[in-house]
Amino acid sequence: MTKVRFAPSPTGKLHVGNVRTAIFNYLFARKAGGTFVLRIDDTDVERSTKAYEDGIRADLTWLGISWDETFKQSDRFDRYEAAAETLKAKGLLYPCYETGEDLDRKRRLQMANGRPPVYDRAALDLTDAEKAGFEAEGRKPHWRFKLSGNPVQWDDMVRGHVSIETSSLSDPILIREDGSFLYTLPSVLDDIESEITHIIRGEDHTTNSGAQIEIFEALGGKAPIFGHQALLVGADGGKLSKRTGSLGIADLRDVDGLEPMAIMSLLARIGTSDPVEAFADVEGILEGFDLGKLSRSPARFDDEELKRVNAKLLHAMPYDVAQPKLAVLGADKGEAVWEAVRPNLETLADAKAWAVLIDGPVTPVIEEPDYAAAAAQHLPAGELDGDSWSVWTNALKEATGRKGKQLFMPLRLMLTGEARGPEMAVLLPLIGRDKVLKRLAGEAA
């Protein structure tokens, strides 16, 4: 059975970059009828917080991304220790005593001599006496995994055939001087023991995957099938990194007031061969989802495109779907008002502002008192309905000789105080005769 995982670190908030990876994994699992695992990568005890973890879970839930299994790496340190001992016993995990300054000096020297800054494996030649000497100085070792030096190859679901020359890589550090684990070993062991079948992640992990495949094999596991998607860039092709704060899922929800399906719709489609569409539910996205459609070129994320998708969703949203959301905002004025204001919405919160045009109080903008008086005089008798606007404006056209913008714009300003907004033919009966007459008389109503 297909089994994938999304493995965020609770050291920060979810943003469009990493949540796109969550979306791809979620859609891939659902399309295959498989299992989606949420793994919390909290081995960095100093920086990981419960607040960030709770935020990650809340953001995913709000987006409609549900998980079938979940666990935290901090509950599995004993398993990582055992795996490290296995690698040590095989001679594949070796201690190194260089300080950060030592390694920087080596890298600078290599680069000055035109060589790639690859770790020279000097630690493999240390004698027991030399190691003891370092220990006596108070140095603690960090531990590196010994790569084979052979090419590692796989067929990537996005990038096609990939070959990584491990001879050109530094042996990766798996354990820090303080005994804490870096990302690599816990991730591999978790993937083995969780029986993950596919790993879908950013292309910045491609080289790292070459090293990880050797660790999979060293621990007696079989490497999953990999798919490395291109990273997100800004609309101008520049990096998003400086803006990840403003592109956090929580901010897009709480500050910008965007709909979850707008974010899902955009992130699932940019960087693919399919056009961006506004999907009302995940089923719509699933129908055409295929990792094979992903481009190897960076996907451009455009804030304005996200807003357009959000607006399209709202313009097509039925009242029964909108009603609970409107109620939370204190903007539920009934189906008739929703139908009137819906075509003008960019965010759901806009509904509250547009509803004020109906409920009032509105301060009318009257630049031509004589025209206001004529408008009041020719307002159709009786209860206003869907035909009243047409009847009214035709009568005014006949009486004043006005037409086009000169006829309509002053009426909009007098009745709404705004130069733009929902259709007046729809608004007029909702405002009602009494408030219309008061506003035409210059009263706030």
From Swiss-Prot:
InterPro entries: aa-tRNA-synth_I_cd-bd, aa-tRNA-synth_I_codon-bd_sub2, aa-tRNA-synth_I_CS, aa_tRNA-synth_I_cd-bd_sf, Glu-tRNA-ligase_bac/mito, Glu/Gln-tRNA-synth, Glu/Gln-tRNA-synth_Ib_cat-dom, GluQ/Sye
Location, primary (coarse class): cytoplasm
A cellular component annotation (GO) from this entry: cytoplasm
Motif 'HIGH' region boundaries: 8-18
Binding positions for ATP per the UniProt entry: K242
Alphabetized PROSITE patterns for the sequence: AA_TRNA_LIGASE_I
Biological process, per Gene Ontology: glutamyl-tRNA aminoacylation
Swiss-Prot/TrEMBL catalytic activity: tRNA(Glu) + L-glutamate + ATP = L-glutamyl-tRNA(Glu) + AMP + diphosphate
Motif ('KMSKS' region): 239-243
Translocase found in the keyword field: no
Coiled-coil segments: none
Keyword Methyltransferase recorded: no
Keywords of the record: Aminoacyl-tRNA synthetase, ATP-binding, Cytoplasm, Ligase, Nucleotide-binding, Protein biosynthesis
An example molecular function term from Gene Ontology annotations: ATP binding
Role this protein plays: Catalyzes the attachment of glutamate to tRNA(Glu) in a two-step reaction: glutamate is first activated by ATP to form Glu-AMP and then transferred to the acceptor end of tRNA(Glu).
Family designation: Belongs to the class-I aminoacyl-tRNA synthetase family. Glutamate--tRNA ligase type 1 subfamily.
Subunit relationships: Monomer.
Name recorded for this polypeptide: Glutamate--tRNA ligase 1
